[in-house]
Each structure stands twice: as C-alpha cells, then as structure tokens.
Swiss-Prot record:
Keywords: Heme, Iron, Metal-binding, Oxygen transport, Transport. It comes from Bos mutus grunniens. Residues 1-141 form the Globin domain. This is Hemoglobin subunit alpha-2. Heterotetramer of two alpha chains and two beta chains. SUPFAM superfamilies: Globin-like (SSF46458). Heme b binds at residue 87. Involved in oxygen transport from the lung to the various peripheral tissues. Red blood cells. It comes from the Eukaryota. One of its GO terms (biological process) is hydrogen peroxide catabolic process.
C-alpha cells in the first residue's frame, strides 16, 4: 500500500519525467533486453536494435500506462484492468518480467534524474512499480 508520502513522491518524480516518458520507457526496454536477454522472447516480431521504431513505440505504450497509473494511484486495478487482461490472457507474459522491467525503469530514472532520485523517492517508485506489477499479474490466477 502506498502511503500519502509515497503517492506524493511518485507524482513528483513522474512529473519530472514529463515529456520524456516515452523516451525513458524505450530506454528502459532496451536496458531490460540487454541486461536480461530472455525477455526478448516476448518480442520475436520486433526489431530490437538500438533506437528501433518498434521499441520506441512499445516504450511509449509502457510510459502511457504508467502515466495513467500515476493518475489513478487510488484505483490501480481499475485503471490497469484492460492491460492486466491483455498480459494474462493473450500475451501470457511471465510475471517475473514485470520485475525486470521495473528494475530497468528505476535505473533509467536514476540515470536521468540523479538529484531527484533520493532514497525516499527510490523506495516510493519501487513500491509503485511493484503495485503496478501486482495488478498486471492479478488475473493470472
């Protein structure tokens, strides 16, 4: 459960991301593919090279979903219900991959927002991404 302080930290940090959300989403995906090569198996039809339009496009989708989640911190299940259905029933993504992408996103944010990425903000973003991951995997059961 996100505390009021966590919610404030998440909103403030995502606000700093601003217009770079799609760019950071794509960078986090590239980072995940490089650091955890097995994640590439879910994207056999993608050009996974650096800067590919497909990775940028999916990065924008990831960023848009996270932006939506930040705007609905008190109702993540409602805000992410369709994505949860998609990932559980159609794409059948192994739940561990959400943790890997979350880690890659945290590293990406820390590299771009070093002065804003305090231990408290890091902890809040980590909790937020864990909650998002939990929601996205909730329909696997």
């Amino acid at each position: 459960v996100l505390s009021a302080a966590d919610k404030g930290n998440v909103k403030a940090a995502w606000g700093k991301v601003g217009g770079h959300a799609a760019e950071y989403g794509a960078e986090a995906l590239e980072r995940m593919f490089l650091s955890f090569p097995t994640t590439k198996t879910y994207f056999p039809h993608f050009d996974l090279s650096h800067g590919s339009a497909q990775v940028k496009g999916h990065g924008a989708k990831v960023a848009a979903a996270l932006t939506k989640a930040v705007g609905h911190l008190d109702d993540l299940p409602g805000a992410l219900s369709e994505l949860s259905d998609l990932h559980a029933h159609k794409l059948r993504v192994d739940p561990v991959n959400f943790k890997l992408l979350s880690h890659s996103l945290l590293v990406t944010l820390a590299s771009h927002l070093p002065s804003d990425f305090t231990p408290a903000v890091h902890a809040s973003l980590d909790k937020f991404l864990a909650n998002v991951s939990t929601v996205l995997t909730s329909k696997y059961r």
